[in-house]
Amino acid sequence: MKIGIIGAGSFGTALGSILADKGYDVTLWTRSEEQARSINENHMNSKHMPDLVLPDRLKASTDLIQVVKDKDMIVSAPPSHALSGILKEIKDHIPPKVPIVSASKGIENESLRLVSEIFESELPGQFHSQLSYLSGPSFAKEMVKRVPTIVSIASKNEATAKRVQEIFSFTYFRTYWTPDVVGVEVGGALKNVIAIAAGVADGLGFGQNTRAALITRGLNEITRMGIKMGADPMTFLGPSGMGDLVLTCCGEASRNRTVGFRLGKGESLKEILSSMNEVAEGVKTTLSTKNLADKLGVEMAITQEVYHMLYEDKDPKEVVRALMSRDLKREGV
């Protein structure tokens, strides 16, 4: 089986490593000639994982069209803000009837579209039944190190979901399928916003009580938004909901938690982002989630305060104070 992966960041590389481990021939697309050489000649991703050895069957190319042509499956893993342009470029070169798996997370800023809505808007209808979405608690480096990991595979087409589930599932990588595309996407995107808040609390020196509070109320916000958009609330108790939220809020490898942590320590957002090697999706997702919540009339207190901090320079200590002094409420969604 030949598989093309769009995006040679940490997560695209990790998914490629799993698939190559299974014996598939995998090609990553990267814009960088240097990165492609590093993967092809030295079996390492010099930019994102310079300390880890990749499988021999994992190759890289700077030719996007060649990466998707004549493949048996395509995996899409670029930052969500780059997705629309990439799909426009490849849509006439995708082989018919191949599974298309998205691993991107986020909500497009201007249109407020979910990743699935971008795919269905940019690709012809003939491909829609082949689409699926992968999300869950999965740090890339741990996947390459073959640490046992579980994720969700969501598709509106059961046959597609089960086919992708079969292709990905391996001794250390287990997948669960669900028809709830919206729920999986909302959980995967919005947990990054909550992780920024959790990082701020850690940076300010608050304890684990505070982190647990943010995770609990954050899950409440995510579920509320998901229900408004038509998701199954039970999805948010699964890998792409609670699982991903806990990992992203607590794990030191979380880019979004790191952004919040450094903000809590007094650094500016500009300083933080300019020093990072990878995209922290939660920064852009905070803006789009805030706007989507306003549009749909969904109360999202943590998201609103993270927005004030990122886009209006509100002091992190004031953010925490505002959250703790809100009107008292009954527990529940």
Curated annotation (Swiss-Prot):
Pathway: Membrane lipid metabolism; glycerophospholipid metabolism. Sn-glycerol 3-phosphate binds at K105, G136, S138, K191, D244, S254, R255, N256. It is found in: Cytoplasm. Keywords: Cytoplasm, Lipid biosynthesis, Lipid metabolism, NAD, NADP, Nucleotide-binding, Oxidoreductase, Phospholipid biosynthesis, Phospholipid metabolism. It comes from the Bacteria. GO terms for cellular component: cytosol. Its EC number is 1.1.1.94. One of its GO terms (molecular function) is glycerol-3-phosphate dehydrogenase [NAD(P)+] activity. GO terms for biological process: carbohydrate metabolic process; glycerol-3-phosphate biosynthetic process; glycerol-3-phosphate catabolic process; glycerophospholipid metabolic process; phospholipid biosynthetic process. The keyword Protein transport does not apply. NADPH binds at S10, F11, R31, K105, A140, R255, V279, E281. The keyword Aminoacyl-tRNA synthetase does not apply. The active site is at K191. Gene3D superfamilies: N-(1-d-carboxylethyl)-l-norvaline Dehydrogenase, domain 2, NAD(P)-binding Rossmann-like Domain. It catalyses: sn-glycerol 3-phosphate + NAD(+) = dihydroxyacetone phosphate + NADH + H(+); sn-glycerol 3-phosphate + NADP(+) = dihydroxyacetone phosphate + NADPH + H(+). Coiled coil: none annotated. Pfam families: NAD_Gly3P_dh_C, NAD_Gly3P_dh_N. Catalyzes the reduction of the glycolytic intermediate dihydroxyacetone phosphate (DHAP) to sn-glycerol 3-phosphate (G3P), the key precursor for phospholipid synthesis. Belongs to the NAD-dependent glycerol-3-phosphate dehydrogenase family. PANTHER family: GLYCEROL-3-PHOSPHATE DEHYDROGENASE, GLYCEROL-3-PHOSPHATE DEHYDROGENASE [NAD(+)] 2, CHLOROPLASTIC. This is Glycerol-3-phosphate dehydrogenase [NAD(P)+]. It comes from Leptospira biflexa serovar Patoc (strain Patoc 1 / ATCC 23582 / Paris).
